[in-house]
Structures are given as structure tokens and as C-alpha cells.
Amino acid sequence: MSLEVAYSRISMTDKEISLLKKCIGNNKIIVEIGSYIGKTTCALAENNTVIAIDPFIDGYDPDDQVVMLGVEEIFKKRIKGKDIIWYKAKSEDVLKSWEIMIDGVFIDGNHMPEALNEDVKWIGFVKKGGIIAFHDYNYKPSVTNFVDEKIRPKYQEIGRERFLIVWRK
């Protein structure tokens, strides 16, 4: 599968990005877990500081074997000169030394339950009134089940578009 075909299948749509930007607002600090080629990363960085976290590892999800070859280079070129701080790491590794409160977290990384359990630990750094967003809701059963069981009972849903769901803390 070519990179273009794989990307078109999994990427955020313009409507999803528009909703996410509207829910976040401007002049915020946002952690993005899972950046791929940086389309959403750059869109969010137009009016915010984005902390992008992606290890660029192949095959973390056995149901979705998107090859990451070349993706990291595209990402690096795309983010150059923008208000983006990039960590080539797993989110749990960055979290170990994290100390700054953030305005929101956007989770679109490894969709396996173990990884989701690690990624949601970032919610502890989201300020009250901040946002918690997930991509691939109603697309990846692991994401849907996780969100319905662990997020829905605790937070207020404020937006949904295609595979994006956004919550207020």
C-alpha cells in the first residue's frame, strides 16, 4: 500500500480538524500523541503550541500495518519553522519527566488498550476546562470501547465529527 493511499484512509478530514481547532481555541498548549505526517499537527500549530509525540514505529497495531517508511522525513519537513516541539518517543516515556500543565491532549497514536491506558495518563496534566480528544472513535473498536468505558463516565462530550470525539475536562 502506498503512503498516499494509507494516509487518505486514516487521516483527519478537514471537518474533523476544524472541529478540533474550534474546541481547543487559540494560544493553548496541546499535546498530540501520534502525529503521522503532521497534517493535524501543523493545523493545530497555526494558533497554538503543539507538543507532538510520535516514535514513528512500524506495526504497533496488528490490525493496521501502515508502513512508516518515509513518514518521519515528511513530518520533519512539514513542521519546520512552526510552533511545534517534537518528541520522537512513546508518550509514556515523555510523561515520565513532564511537569507542565497543558490545555488539552489529542490522542491518535497506538490504538491498543495497553497504549491507550498509558496515553490517558496525560489527562492528569490537562487543566480544568481543557480538552481531551480521540481520533478513530467508531472506527477502531479498541478506541471506541476504551472511550466508552473510561472517558464517557467522567467527562462532558463537546463535539463529534466522523472518527473524532472531543471531551471537556
Predicted regions and their residues:
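S-adenosylmethionine/decaboxylated-SAM
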Residues: 3-7, 14-169
